[in-house]
Amino acid sequence: MKALVILGFLFLSVAVQGKVFERCELARTLKKLGLDGYKGVSLANWLCLTKWESSYNTKATNYNPSSESTDYGIFQINSKWWCNDGKTPNAVDGCHVSCSELMENDIAKAVACAKHIVSEQGITAWVAWKSHCRDHDVSSYVEGCTL
């Protein structure tokens, strides 16, 4: 019985933690999902963005008290403008997606929303990209990856 309880907690912690991508694994996944060069944004820039936004973690969240909104998932997509979490006041839901879907291990919906955001606002919609990736050599983010 004790072993079952421990096993249950182990599975629960994996479910809560989500998937933390290895850098090259994420590069291959983003390329497969069509982000390499999408709207002129290189794969290396997407890797830099996701590293600084979420450390490649699909379950990452960050609450923003000033806007009473939350950023979700590997791209840290905001509930005020892009997804519906059912609790953010005056949310727009521009991607027409539940915020919880942006935290799935299968990141196809998160990528689709990121494509929508970059189509409307460009890569500068992400503060982490402006702070850590813009005007930097980001080639190291894809270096050594078999793409």
Swiss-Prot record:
Keyword Signal: yes
Tissue: Stomach-specific.
Residues passing through the membrane, by range: none
Keywords: Antimicrobial, Bacteriolytic enzyme, Digestion, Disulfide bond, Glycosidase, Hydrolase, Signal
Coiled-coil residue spans: none
Residue ranges constituting the C-type lysozyme domain according to the UniProt record: 19-147
Annotated SMART domains: LYZ1
Entry's Gene Ontology molecular function annotations: lysozyme activity
More info: Lysozyme C is capable of both hydrolysis and transglycosylation; it also shows a slight esterase activity. It acts rapidly on both peptide-substituted and unsubstituted peptidoglycan, and slowly on chitin oligosaccharides. The ruminant gastric lysozymes, which digest symbiotic bacteria coming with cud from the rumen, are much more resistant to inactivation by pepsin than are other lysozymes.
Name of the protein: Lysozyme C-2
